[in-house]
Amino acid sequence: LLRTSTLASDSLDLLSLLYSDKNYSQPLSVGFKGNPHMGSLVLNSMIGGPAYNAFKSTFSNGDRIFIISSICGGTGAAGFPLLLQNFRQSDNNHIRDSYIGALSVMPYFRLSDPGQTSDIDSNDFMTKTKSALTYYTRQDFTNLYDSMYYIADPDKQTHPYTNDEIKQENKAHIIELLGAYSIFHFAINNSHRGTVNEYCIGSNDDKINFDTIGNSTKQALGHDLTSLHLLSKLHNTIKENKNNLSFCKVNNFNSSFFSDPFFTDAENGLELFLNDYYQSWIKELDENDRGFNPFDLKLKGKFNTLINGNGHYVE
């Protein structure tokens, strides 16, 4: 990206102020590890590339843009402002004039104290967050987006730090679930330029359920998530007992029906999703220090006490 051999000496002097020797040699395959000055350089080189041009050529009137980024590190903190400014300066009028929303995820976990070889120190998360917010709240920047969503939970959950993207195992977290919900909120709302949204749970409890997650989120998630959870609990039982269940006989829910690739496909089958992905996801949400436990995961058989809390959700 930086062809230093062709630069004048005064340009090299300037670069030495911005980038250390470690920056020059740091691999970027997993992001910029808390170095937004590196991220902005790399991401800017992608503007005008094949992927960006494909997006630009297919974007049409009425389409919307939603940018998801973290704010305490390098990749997201650098990429969000860069993308936003490029969209608003695009020569595609549909992109330039579109509704643009963004989710900025602030710290919601800490890492164990870093060692000498660690590239990331979570003690710097809040400092970097405050630095980014100073820029994000400037009027010339707020005029670029229509709706901004902020979410954080800085005082919960410490993860052991591993300087390896494969071995660094972070559990699914309620912040990620609520952050994803902001996409749906943005899709159905026409906010005026510079609108800011912040999330507040109904009660500051270590374990959150449908009673304490907040009324609008409860209404949005309660019915559908409960239906999905019931399906995950009942599907295998129904399949195993299909020959003895009258509704299976009446509706031809037989061996041929349950052998359909819709259920059994090794990559996209429903059973793979329910047994391997959904069950581990809902379990990880429950295990965090700030846990989301809408259901009694230990319950077997009768489901009249399946839903934690008072058991009511809005249909």
Label every PLM stretch briefly.
Residues 69-79:
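Gly/Ser/Thr-rich loops at beta-strand to alpha-helix junctions
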Residues 1-63, 71, 83-86, 94-315:
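Terminal, contiguous helix-loop blocks that mediate binding/assembly
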